[in-house]
């Protein structure tokens, strides 16, 4: 039972946490900057002593001792009003938004550092690109990214991000903006500066950069559909649509670059069966905006709770997941789609009452995952995890995912090499097991190449003359060398992973 079920009483101030409770909560936030502190607890199987375990345990204690009421916490990163139930957080922020009492939200890292978020702008539901037309839009950029794989089939983060940002500009702004990398840089600068003194200058630069695309919109893009929607209703114009386009581009860019890669990792380990469930699970488990702070600029009352101006409301859905009856280890239900919209804080935006641009970004991510998996099979190289033990945090920049061609078939009479160069590229900074996984993948590729060479040598077309027989011997010799190399690499990989 949440406070939403309680009868209204006279308004009163939120209860303050005790000094020891503040100290434990602060220590848990500081520890988020030290990922290695989880290693001893995980090695002993004591998940309750990890950073997230301690935080959730403290929140469960506060929820019991405060009857589920929001509590005022004091930390080295500032005082926060923390709702202890997801329903309470949603209700409190909705009431504040309705009263016009909220300043724009800022993001909060796990270690307590604040960062700018793209200012939320409503996006008309019927202005989004229809799902049926999204299938064709990502194809060209997905093919470019797949072609940019390294020799061992893995993806370089910079190449992946560059390709996904191209795709995002194509879908949101139009074909003319695909090569406009400066647009992405200006957008990133404006987003990071949100809420600071330099924001207006950066926002003006972003408006200038978007102006040509708004003046001559691509009808197949989100911008074209948004302007057509506004003109059909006699509303606004190109300049009025600029903030909505910028917000949608920021969210789609992040979903395509980060969430899609996480979804591919989930598919690789069998933690999701379809692109829709993979994207939904990635956004649920590792939301790009995992925590947000909402400054209150005017007094308001939510039920019997009086919230004063100057208060900062902290909303962290991940911490409350287990407390609200949803197990932290549960997966998204089969058939779930993040694009359908779910109650609670949008995973890509800190809007207090939902965000249509987030739903559109999730839909784009689903189509990108579908386009990738229609051509290649994702293989997780590092970090290592399994479907039944997914990590609490997963930085997409640390993911090493290999893409294996679906069309490659060993021993079919043709020489099949996935990529022109089959030289593995080391993953600097990873554990020996990660190098071992790369070596295993290289050994498998060498073995397949040896099999395809042997199958090619067995073709009857070489029987027609002396030159054919001589060339067959060359093929067989090369196949033998590849097989021997595969055995050697596999032995080395075994030593690395043992």
Where are these regions (language model features)?
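N-terminal secretion-targeting helices of virulence/extracellular proteins
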Residues: 351, 409-498
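Conserved cytochrome P450 K-helix/beta-meander segment immediately N-terminal to the heme-binding cysteine loop
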Residues: 316-352, 382-386
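N-terminal membrane-proximal hinge/A-helix region immediately C-terminal to the signal-anchor transmembrane segment
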Residues: 2-107
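Cytochrome P450 heme-binding "Cys pocket" and the immediately downstream C-terminal segment
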Residues: 359-392
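Conserved cytochrome P450 K-helix E-x-x-R motif and the immediately C-terminal K′/meander segment
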Residues: 51-63, 273-305, 315-324
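Cytochrome P450 catalytic core segment centered on helix I
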Residues: 182-239
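Central I-helix of cytochrome P450 enzymes
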Residues: 225-283, 357, 365
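Cytochrome P450
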Residues: 74-78, 135-140, 147-170, 180-182, ...
């Amino acid at each position: 039972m949440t406070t939403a079920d309680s009868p209204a009483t006279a308004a009163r101030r939120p209860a303050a946490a005790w000094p020891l409770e503040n100290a434990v909560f602060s220590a848990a936030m500081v520890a988020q900057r030290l990922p290695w502190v989880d290693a001893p607890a995980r090695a002993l199987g004591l998940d309750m002593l990890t950073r997230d375990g301690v935080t959730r345990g403290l929140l469960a204690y506060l929820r019991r001792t405060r009857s589920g009421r929001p509590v005022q916490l004091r930390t080295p990163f500032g005082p926060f009003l923390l709702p202890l139930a997801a329903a309470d957080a949603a209700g409190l922020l909705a009431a504040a938004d309705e009263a016009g009492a909220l300043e724009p939200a800022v993001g909060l890292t796990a270690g307590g550092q604040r960062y700018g978020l793209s200012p939320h702008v409503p996006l008309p539901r019927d202005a989004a690109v229809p799902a049926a037309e999204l299938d064709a839009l990502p194809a060209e950029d997905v093919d470019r990214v797949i072609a940019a794989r390294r020799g061992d089939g893995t993806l370089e983060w910079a190449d992946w991000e560059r390709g996904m940002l191209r795709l995002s500009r194509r879908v949101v702004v139009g074909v003319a903006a695909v090569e406009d990398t400066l647009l992405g840089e200006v957008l990133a600068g404006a987003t990071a500066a949100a809420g600071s003194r330099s924001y207006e200058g950066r926002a003006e630069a972003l408006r200038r950069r978007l102006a040509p695309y708004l003046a001559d919109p691509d009808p197949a893009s989100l911008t074209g559909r948004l302007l057509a929607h506004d003109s059909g209703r006699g509303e606004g114009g190109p300049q009025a649509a600029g903030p909505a386009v910028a917000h949608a581009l920021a969210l789609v860019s992040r979903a395509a670059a980060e969430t899609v890669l996480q979804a591919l990792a989930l598919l690789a380990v069998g933690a999701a069966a379809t692109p829709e469930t993979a994207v939904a699970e990635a956004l649920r488990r590792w939301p790009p905006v995992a925590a947000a702070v909402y400054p209150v600029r005017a007094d308001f009352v939510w039920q019997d709770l009086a919230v004063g101006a100057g208060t900062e409301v902290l909303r962290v859905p991940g911490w409350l997941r287990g407390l609200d009856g949803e197990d932290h280890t549960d997966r998204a239900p089969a058939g779930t789609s993040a694009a359908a919209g779910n109650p609670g804080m949008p995973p890509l935006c800190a809007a207090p009452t939902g965000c249509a641009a987030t739903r559109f970004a999730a839909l784009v991510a689903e189509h990108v995952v579908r386009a990738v998996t229609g051509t290649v099979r994702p293989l997780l190289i590092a970090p290592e995890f399994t479907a039944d033990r997914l990590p609490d945090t997963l930085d997409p920049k640390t993911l090493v995912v290999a893409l294996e061609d679906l069309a490659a078939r060993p021993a079919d009479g043709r020489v099949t090499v996935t990529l022109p160069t089959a030289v593995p590229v080391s993953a600097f900074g990873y554990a020996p097991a990660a190098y071992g996984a790369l070596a295993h993948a290289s050994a498998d590729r060498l073995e397949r190449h040896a099999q395809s060479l042997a199958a090619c040598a067995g073709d009857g077309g070489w029987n027609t003359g002396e030159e054919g027989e001589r060339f067959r011997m060359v093929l067989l010799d090369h196949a033998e060398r590849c097989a021997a190399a595969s055995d050697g690499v596999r032995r080395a990989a075994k030593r690395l992973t043992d």
